[in-house]
Amino acid sequence: LGDVYKRQMNKRDGNIVAFLMELEYMDVEKPSGYSPEETGSKYTQAGQDSAGLTAAVEDPESVKRPNIIVIMDEAFSDLAVRGDFTTNEDYMPFIHRLQQGAENTRTGYLNVSVLGGNTANTEFEFLTGNTIGFLPQGSVAYQQYVQKETPSLASYLKELDYHTVAIHPYYASGWDRDRVYPLLGFDEFLSQDDFTNPKRIRNYISDESSFAKIIE
């Protein structure tokens, strides 16, 4: 929604005024208590912890590797999270069964930092554990900050001999995903060009076809 407001401000006040009003948000304030030394120490410790976990897998061939699937679904919503919402029949029985404690299931809520767009920033935060809260307003981490190999869940799983695949049912070049995903450790990237006669809703590939591609 922030981008919408910016466009409205440009239209209402003109480009020069809008640009000057945005200048104050282009600088990032140093967090309270921050020091390069403390950050470096925590980074080193995190690396040691990760190395220990990886080293614990002495015989990779003997380790079971369950499929790990993460779905970020812009088209999905449960209106019940907004408050009291009742219907005469369950509108998402499968999802609700999972939430109620289905076998081998853990559920919860994940708050994200974007609304109405900039999905690449949600991906960036989830995959890397970094926050865009420390970046200038309007930043898109994929386009501006991922310029070299960057540690992520994908790269960590590669260390455990997983084959890592990213699927996005739209243009491969969107938010520079085709350039960024390999830097995050993905072995393979499937975009809309890799779908054969998918079902579409308002010109977009449907969730049904997207999930079928995952299963495939």
Segments (PLM) and residue ranges:
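Soluble catalytic regions of membrane-associated enzymes that act on cell-envelope
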Residues: D3-E216
